[in-house]
UniProtKB/Swiss-Prot annotation:
Name of the protein in question: Alanine racemase
Modification sites for N6-(pyridoxal phosphate)lysine: K35
Entry function: Catalyzes the interconversion of L-alanine and D-alanine. May also act on other amino acids.
Pfam families: Ala_racemase_C, Ala_racemase_N
Gene source species: Psychrobacter sp. (strain PRwf-1)
SUPFAM superfamilies: Alanine racemase C-terminal domain-like, PLP-binding barrel
Gene3D superfamilies tied to this protein: Alanine racemase (3.20.20.10), Lyase, Ornithine Decarboxylase, Chain A, domain 1 (2.40.37.10)
Gene: alr
GO cellular component: cytosol
Pathway annotation from the record: Amino-acid biosynthesis; D-alanine biosynthesis; D-alanine from L-alanine: step 1/1
Reactions catalysed according to its record: L-alanine = D-alanine
Matching NCBIfam families: alr
PANTHER family: ALANINE RACEMASE, ALANINE RACEMASE, CATABOLIC-RELATED
Length: 374
């Protein structure tokens, strides 16, 4: 059987959630982001490990429905809001809270007021503070908030950082200032009980004065670093996903021999070449550069060997340089990414080789690899 597989460490997920809980004040609640099938990890596998979160955030109502079917009965927030008036009504039936970021959504909320004891009586009002993607502008926020409060809604003011991963970026201070001023005005002029949520993963770590009432951790829950130039290990985060395969063939090749599509790699010396049963059809990135590497584990040995990826990544296979591995064997385990403390490259390292982010690699893992939950 083809050996490509994903190992999901539920204890690591719980550990990372506890890191968030320990970082924020006791009065701050945690909305764990599980959009895109828990960042590619599989929400059904992750849900038990996230039981101590105060709520979950998803991108859309379809994701929320699935999570309700899995038995989650706590707060569930639609981060993109609803896309129609009908969906607003459906979200009330499913007891989902929603972000409101444009005037049509306001009108749907006014047209269909949830029951008085429904969690949907709380809405998340989105302010555009500088991300310039979604949300109301500061000068229209007051009227929107007043109409919702008058109708019987409780509000959580929310926004999103554009550059929280780079703490010294000048936009961060501007966004924080815009947000705090808007929050103060709403509390003074509309409702003093309005709550607030600003921080994503990077914000939680970099802007501790801005934790407010809710934080929204995402990528840090899954053990990938949200902060530019700081590794997940340095942040005491543990990788939840490990990606592994095995050696399926080994060949000796002479200097001057090319490997793979496009003959991009040409050996400059005699090398031992290994073929690994993994490719972009499994979610390994096709566009890795010459810095990408894997970890090869030989049977009966505790140490592992760092081996460069050579040639182009194909749909089902990659080639690696095994020259420095003593007596490699077909069937030996190959770690594509995982726990650096166990000798594997981190997902962030491979993402850097592919000129992207760990977020994307985790979300792009396909259904072909087998799943194993620890």
């Amino acid at each position: 059987m083809r050996s490509a597989s994903i190992i999901l460490d539920s204890k690591a997920l719980t550990h990372n959630l506890n890191c968030v809980i320990d970082t924020v004040p006791d009065t701050t609640k945690v909305l764990a982001m599980v959009k895109a099938d828990a960042y590619g990890h599989g929400i059904a596998h992750c849900l038990p490990a996230l039981k101590d979160a105060d709520g979950l955030g998803v991108a859309c109502f379809t994701e929320a429905q699935h999570i309700r079917e899995l038995g989650w009965d706590k707060i569930l927030v639609l981060i993109e809001g609803v896309f129609s008036e009908t969906e607003w009504q459906q979200s009330i039936e499913a007891q989902c809270q929603s972000i409101i970021h444009h005037q049509d959504q306001v009108q749907w909320a006014l047209n269909h007021l949830p029951p008085e004891n429904s969690p949907c009586r709380t809405v998340w009002l989105k302010l555009n503070t500088g991300m310039n993607r979604l949300g109301f502008e500061s000068d229209e926020l007051g009227d929107v908030a007043q109409s919702l409060v008058d109708a019987g809604y409780e509000l959580i003011l929310t926004s999103h950082f554009a550059n929280a991963d780079a703490p010294n970026h000048p936009s961060n201070a501007k966004q924080i200032d815009t947000f705090t001023q808007a929050l103060q005005q709403l509390r003074e002029q509309v409702d003093p009980s309005i709550k607030a949520s600003l921080c994503n993963s990077a914000g939680i770590l970099n802007f501790k004065a801005c934790h407010f009432d809710w934080v929204r951790p995402g990528i840090m829950l899954y053990g990938s670093s949200p902060v530019e130039g700081v590794s997940a290990q340095m942040l005491k985060l543990k990788p939840v996903m490990s990606f592994k395969a095995s050696l399926m063939a080994i060949h000796n090749i002479a200097a001057g021999t090319s490997v793979g599509y496009g003959s991009r790699f040409v050996a400059n010396r005699p090398i031992v070449k290994g073929i690994v049963s993994i490719g972009y059809g499994d979610g390994y990135p096709r566009v890795v550069d010459g810095s990408a590497w894997v970890s090869v584990q030989l049977a009966g040995e505790h140490s592992s060997y760092k081996c460069p990826v050579i040639g182009r990544v194909a749909m089902d296979m990659i080639a690696i340089d095994l020259t420095d591995v003593p007596n490699p064997k077909v069937g030996s385990q190959v770690m594509l990414w995982g726990d650096p403390e166990l000798g594997a490259p981190s997902v962030d390292e491979i993402a850097e080789s592919a000129h992207t982010l760990g977020y994307e690699l985790l979300c792009r893992v396909t259904q072909r690899p087998l799943r194993e939950v620890l």
